[in-house]
Amino acid sequence: MVVQAPIQLPFRILGETADLIAIDKPPSLLIHPSKPGGPVTLWDRLRELLAYEIASGGQVSLINRLDRETSGIVLVAKNAQAARHCSMAMARGEIAKEYLALTVGWPKSEEWSVREPILRLGEVEDSRIWLKRGVHPMGVPAHTDFRVMKRIMHPKVGPISLVHCIPHTGRTHQIRVHLTHSGYPVVGDKIYGPSEGCYLEFIETGWSAALAEKLWLPRHALHSCSLRVALDKVQHSWNSALPDDLLRFLIGSPEGC
């Protein structure tokens, strides 16, 4: 009898039901393959993990997606019925998602909301980064609520904040765009941080000491920390704590006011 080695998962499983599985995605793990022969992705390992469900006719579907550098909760449906239910719930705004972000600066208010439309900037102006978004009156409606959880004086960066973010719509880069629009960009953000040149430099050279001086972190400090959805009248919820790389960044940083 051939005994197969256990699958080495590059992520943690937060919880699983007959219909759903919640994944805690680490930073820098791609969701989908970007090119043939590229690095292992979350989708690759999911298909291995759920091989039995797939072989039995199951339809594995990602309910939400995270940018490569964003860490945290990714919800996966294990069959077509659950995928359809969750997709409809998402469209109705009935899947509650929450994030934690480390931002540059101390916001003037403890809580604030941003209701500003977002579009891809290349649609209305010259942009060196095709995927870059921005606030623009011709964009689609977007709404995010923010609350300051902690103000910190970081020894390298200066004033930074731990901000709780609740997106009520699901636009690409929404939280990052709305935080930058508010004047408090996400720490480590190559596109919406100090200069979009950081992103272009990273594409050209990879992570470097020069970029570390400008960005402080090799990835943007955004983490999906909570997700809730009801399925068949049962409320499901999952939580994910701030990951180690962001916690290490905060070590030795005295709390501010």
Which stretches of residues belong to each language-model region?
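RNA pseudouridine synthases
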Residues: 1-257
